[in-house]
Amino acid sequence: MTALENNSPYIAQPKILVATDCIVFGFDEGILKLLVFRRRIDPLKGEWSLIGSFVNEEESVPDAARRVLLQFTGLENIFLEELRVYSDVERDSGARCISIAQYALIRINDYDREQVELHGAKWFALEDIPQLVLDHNVMIFDALDRLRQKTTHKPIGFELLPEKFTIPQLQSLYEAIHQTKLDDRNFRKKLLSFDLLIKLDEKDKSTSKKGAFLYRFDYGKYKKLEESGINFVL
């Protein structure tokens, strides 16, 4: 980086902190959950908070978010998307700080439980989310709204499921995200009409003796359809 002259406009500007806060969604036994932790710095130390960090000088915002997610969950290469910028002047009483929020979708059985416990993090069902610090509850509301919009035309919901899943599990996920009951027959019919599920010669017998066939999402086929302009609309 080139050294700046003392009279440079850059030097004269007030210093504003940049942070990233991560809204981490997981899906467990029919329930959509969020990962939060007890804040470890003042102000509001000990209060419930989204996981996050200040952005270091040498990293981008997505890199900072990936660093935080690895630190708290032990996971890499997970779905991550920028949500929006939160820049209210008085949003943080500690200092002037802009937060660029990201939302992440993880397979809840894949995370490192020791890492989560080490940082005092905890999963909460949506309806049980406590009051969080700063504007973090607003971030959750916005992230949930984005997730609902996105899952109507993009297959990102599969990021929350195991690699092998049943159609009832997938339906349960969409019902949890959209907070509505779906018709079993119509959901299955529409889902299978996309021809994007690979039926496996395996069954999940955890809920019945007969069991339900397991499927895998065909990402390769979806990419080709997406390139041709066909959307995944449920």
Segments from the language model and where they lie:
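N-terminal strand-loop-strand
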Residues: 7-48
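Active-site segment of metal-dependent pyrophosphate-handling enzymes
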Residues: 16-18, 62-66, 70-112, 148-157, ...
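Conserved Nudix-box catalytic region and its N-terminal flanking loop in Nudix hydrolases
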Residues: 31-72, 85, 152-172
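Short, His- and charge-rich active-site/binding loops that engage polyanionic ligands
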Residues: 34, 39-41, 45, 52, ...
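NUDIX/MutT-family hydrolases
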Residues: 103, 113-147, 162-168, 186-195, ...
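Short helix-coil junctions and helix-kink-helix linkers
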Residues: 172-181
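RNA substrate-recognition surfaces in RNA-acting enzymes
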Residues: 182-213
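Long, intrinsically disordered, low-complexity Ser/Thr/Pro-rich regulatory/activation regions
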Residues: 203-234
